[in-house]
Curated annotation (Swiss-Prot):
Coiled-coil ranges per UniProt: none
UniProt organism field: Rickettsia helvetica
The protein's name in its UniProt record: Elongation factor Tu
Key word Disulfide bond present: no
Lineage start: Bacteria, Pseudomonadati, Pseudomonadota, Alphaproteobacteria, Rickettsiales
InterPro entries to which the protein is assigned, alphabetical: EF-Tu_GTP-bd (IPR041709), EF-Tu_GTPase (IPR050055), EFTu-like_2 (IPR004161), EFTU_2 (IPR033720), G_TR_CS (IPR031157), P-loop_NTPase (IPR027417), Small_GTP-bd (IPR005225), T_Tr_GTP-bd_dom (IPR000795)
Reactions performed catalytically: GTP + H2O = GDP + phosphate + H(+)
Residues engaged in binding GTP: 19-26, 81-85, 136-139
Amino acid sequence: MAKAKFERTKPHVNIGTIGHVDHGKTSLTAAITIVLAKTGGAKATAYDQIDAAPEEKERGITISTAHVEYETKNRHYAHVDCPGHADYVKNMITGAAQMDGAILVVSAADGPMPQTREHILLAKQVGVPAMVVFLNKVDMVDDPDLLELVEMEVRELLSKYGFPGDEIPVIKGSALQALEGKPEGEKAINELMDAVDSYIPQPVRATDKPFLMPIEDVFSISGRGTVVTGRVESGIIKVGEEIEIVGLKDTQKTTCTGVEMFRKLLDEGQSGDNVGILLRGTKREEVERGQVLAKPGSIKPHDKFEAEVYVLSKEEGGRHTPFTNDYRPQFYFRTTDVTGTIKLPFDKQMVMPGDNATFTVELIKPIAMQEGLKFSIREGGRTVGAGVVTKINN
């Protein structure tokens, strides 16, 4: 059987459902596929198919995630749903499932709960750009004043964590009614998808971002100069363009005099390509793995930052004991490890395996970084944590 070719006729967006346990995230995910299947925009996927999410490994961490895909009139969506709260924390911090936007599911019968707060905070920390709210289980609430109160609470909570709480669309409905095929249930799902279509912005494609390539290897080719290899993370590099070598040492300027892929010479390399880049006048010993090639001025090296981190549990192969202030592990950014010291907030004595925490890191050498950059924490060659840079401290 030939594999169906993925037709990319519509713009693609990655989204996910977030919210408190039992507020109906998985029911909503199933309802979206079932309602959109009626117009041919999805394959109807039952609740139990989504709930039995397969385990995946991302940077040594096991995460259960269900993926469904569907399309509206305007877009193609890849949608992630996680069965457990811990899976969300890991997913958002590792970026295993990149989210361009989220659907926050809140039960109208219960209102915002602790994980509602935690997911909103995490979404802000890891840079989820926008979200839409689905107030679920409205069929269980008879009092319209109560619905209004819950909506106000959710909007206040979103504003508190830096989202535009007053303007975020809030759709009221019942995923269960939609699953049962009731017209009011389906109407709410269609309203929700219209809101997602119009309110969640189209992500900037990787090729439209400034050029950046983490250096994996460096070679010296006699008579031609120094070649660095790696996978282009974003943007496009053209032969003849000026670039900077950033991280670990002082930033150096150089020029790309050749781009090679699979032993063929190209005019340009673009995001996703594994390329060799020839650098004019750069000596082999001036460049090393762990640095990046970048568009001049687009990224700076830093050695102090704040991070949101998930610490692996003992069962996941992490530490067996908590760590305290001044813990000095290795931080693995893109292609290299750099030693750093962890500074915990004043009110935190220690971080337990299986927890997520916010703290400051001071590296012994600067790394090219921007907010949103992912990293692993390693100790003796094994991964003990995963994190994301939330703020750079100069």
